[in-house]
Amino acid sequence: MAEKTYPMTLEEKEKLEKELEELKLVRRPEIVERIKIARSYGDLSENSEYEAAKDEQAFVEGQISTIETKIRYAEIVNSDAVAADEVAIGKTVTVQEVGETEEEVYHIVGAAGADVFANKISNESPIGHALIGKKTGDVATIETPAGSYDVKILKVEKTK
C-alpha cells in the first residue's frame, strides 16, 4: 500500500525540518535531563515531576514521529507549474462571498503550513479543498459543518 503524500511548498518543508531539529536537539535533551532529575527524588510512584516529564517526553516523541513522516513523504508543489490564475498550493487567493461586499484573502498551503491567524489555509480544509483547481472568475461552493456557501474568486497570484 502506498504511503500518503504530504503536498507542501519547499518553504513549508524547510520549516518542518527546523522544527524537527529544535525538537531533537533542544527539547528532547531538556526532557531527558528533567526525567533524570526527577528520578533522583526517589519514589517514582508519587513523583509528579517524573510523571509530567514522561508525559511531555511521549508528546515530543509523537511530534518528532509525525514530522519525520511528513518530511519523508513530502511532495514539493511548484506553484509555477500551474496556470497563473489557477488556485494551487503556494498561491494567494482573493475571494468574495456571493452576495457580500467584503473580500477575504487566503494563502493556500499544505496541511503542515496551515495557520488560520495568518490566513494560511490548508489545501485539505473545506475552503482550500473547494478552491484548489479553480481559476479567477470561477465560483466555488464551500461545504462546512454549518452549511454551504458560494465564493467568487477575484484574484489568484503567487504567494510572495
Swiss-Prot record:
Transcription keyword on record: yes
A biological process term (GO) from this entry: DNA-templated transcription elongation
Pfam families, A to Z: GreA_GreB, GreA_GreB_N
Residue ranges of coiled coil: 1-31
GO MF annotation: an example: RNA polymerase binding
Keywords per UniProt: Coiled coil, DNA-binding, Transcription, Transcription regulation
SS bond list: none
Function statement: Necessary for efficient RNA polymerase transcription elongation past template-encoded arresting sites. The arresting sites in DNA have the property of trapping a certain fraction of elongating RNA polymerases that pass through, resulting in locked ternary complexes. Cleavage of the nascent transcript by cleavage factors such as GreA or GreB allows the resumption of elongation from the new 3'terminus. GreA releases sequences of 2 to 3 nucleotides.
Family classification: Belongs to the GreA/GreB family.
Protein's name in the database: Transcription elongation factor GreA
Lineage: Bacteria, Bacillati, Bacillota, Bacilli, Lactobacillales
